[in-house]
Amino acid sequence: MKKITGLFVSALLLLSSCGSVPVTGRKQVLLVSDSEVLTSSLTQYSEYIKSAPISTNTKGKAMVTRVGQKIAAATEEYLKSNGLASEVKNFAWEFNLVKDNQVNAFCMPGGKIVVYEGLLNICSSDDELAVVVGHEVAHAVAKHSNERISQELLAQYGAQILGQALSDKSERIQKIGNTVYGLGAQYGVTLPSSRKHESEADYM
């Protein structure tokens, strides 16, 4: 009975938590609310900014802000013109240039954009920087963070169900089952999803 109940609850979770990615229309499972993701993201971002060495490169900071504002405006305009105006409230845009030689940038849920100085050594024009920042913003618009969190929650729940199903089996069988499940979750869900998210962000 426990096994059947577990499967039934899982099915209900999946059916009640489906969403679609803007632009691509791909179906995705989102078990965590936007408000929960945004609250967690803002907390992490605030802690990061407190300790991050903010750049004093005036020209670079102006470039990041200029590009970021254009992408933010384009993103909001797209959402509004495609029946997704309610999503705009989830973005409180911020743009920061961090003193770090890494060639990197990221956009957290909620539109918190951080660019590392090292990236400006590669992206010397607004258009070049816009390609990278636009890619990162696409991850936020597509709610890829929420989707990854949801996949982790499903994996944890699946492990619990498997544990119940194998509870009357030998310890060796339980270990084998857990190992196979872990590998299946990693190579069957997590890694393919990561590649899918990158391709989707490029497309968007």
Regions found by a protein language model. Name each.
Residues K2-G6, C18-M204:
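A Zn2+-metalloprotease active-site environment signal
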